[in-house]
Amino acid sequence: MGFTLAIVGRPNVGKSTLFNRLVGRKLALVDDLPGVTRDRRIHDAKLYDLKFQVIDTAGLEEAANDSLEARMRAQTEAAISEADAVLFVIDAKAGITPADSTFAEAVRRSGKPVVLVANKAEARGSEAGMYDAFQLGLGEPCPISAEHGQGMPDLRDAIVELLGEERVFAEERQEEAADEVFTPAAVGALVGDDIEDPDAEEIPAYDATKPLRIAIVGRPNAGKSTLINTMLGEDRLLTGPEAGITRDSISADWEWHGRKIKLFDTAGMRRKARVQEKLEKLSVADGLRAIRFAEVVIIVLDATIPFEKQDLQIADLIIREGRAPVIAFNKWDLIEDRQMVLADLYEKTARLLPQVRGLRAVPISGERGQGIDKLMENVVKTHEIWNRRISTGRLNRWLEGVIAHQPPPAVSGRRLKVKYMTQVKTRPPGFVVSCSRPDAMPQSYVRYLINGLRETFDMPGVPIRLSLRTSDNPFAGRAKKKK
């Protein structure tokens, strides 16, 4: 194995659950009681193309030297010294505790490279915990759900970025491993990589050379496989008039204008009531995993019968999963009055999918290869917006102007005070607003802020997350401390 990772953190944040997921089986005891793991376990692990050793440690405890907890802490310190890097796990649902801060300082003192892992990120309210995590001084939190397997692609990317490709691939760089990097059957994804500290002066430019993961979804027989075959220039996938020919998610490597792309053709996604065969149920589940693993999702609609109820359900699922959607109106070669039909389709897109204003939609013919370049141009632009980060200074200057022009309404005779705003993640863009009474803030005003963000910072066509919290500005006074 090329390198070793130690999983550390206070008790009951999900370290052993993450360990079990990385090793592929339940080797570590998992329970809700703190301190279940009393010693460290070392095992071979794999995360897509990364092969390494992982150490599961006892939860860090503050304790007297002669106690069991002290010996558990000694085991953890030994694991840190043996490891090449540390996965420091916090509970995003519970937020940051004094114990997290104490042991984050201990990990920093070790000098080992650290990935801050925000576990239980699928839980409601976890955005606030990720917001608090900045105060640990361990960098941008990588949100995951170890229990459900969400966020694993982002964790993989964070490890590679931390240690460098030469280090992580020093011993093994085989073709089979490369092919397994993006196997959708083992994947569930949330959000978050390529993110800088909110206090950073410079925002990193979009990397147009980075490989791109695209899932192609739609109702059965919408032309998904035909589109991929045209892109690849070969009959890689079985196509035909029968709905449901593609039974599973099939991946293919492609290049567009020199950029490497992994394409996923998913099984046609039917309504649940019509998914009867066990094999087809598995195929649809595989398609859902492919969506979660993708960065951009191309929704293929049959232009002759667009916006069926199931089309809207698929689009809503993609938006809720936080992926970057682009619509392809396929079979455009069958449309006669194209200008009138296209205007009607654009109007329906805006009206039927109001969750994401400015959703990009392109007419194509997968069979004839028409509109593919235009489609890909929109895919790349949407991906860039999905990865966008806005500096804290710009956000708060904008917020001041918004409040001056249109302050939040009074609730029960009391004004709501909006104090501060920061971006806590990208992929999709996620923001937290600090205010006096989050529970009292009308959802109409939250939507007003989201729409303002989208318009002011040019973010059409991607989901935007915005949550409210009561805590004070965590970055206030930081500049004074540096003096």
Swiss-Prot record:
It comes from Brucella canis (strain ATCC 23365 / NCTC 10854 / RM-666). GO terms for molecular function: GTP binding. Keywords: GTP-binding, Nucleotide-binding, Repeat, Ribosome biogenesis. Associates with the 50S ribosomal subunit. InterPro entries: G_ENGA, GTP-bd, GTPase_Der, KH_dom-like, KH_dom-like_a/b, P-loop_NTPase, Small_GTP-bd. Residues 388-472 form the KH-like domain. GTP 2 binds at residues 218-225, 265-269, 330-333. Residues 3-167, 212-387 form the EngA-type G domain. GTP 1 binds at residues 9-16, 56-60, 119-122. GO terms for biological process: ribosome biogenesis. CDD domains: EngA1, EngA2. Belongs to the TRAFAC class TrmE-Era-EngA-EngB-Septin-like GTPase superfamily. EngA (Der) GTPase family. The keyword Nucleotide-binding applies. This is GTPase Der. GTPase that plays an essential role in the late steps of ribosome biogenesis. It comes from the Bacteria. The keyword Nucleotide-binding applies.
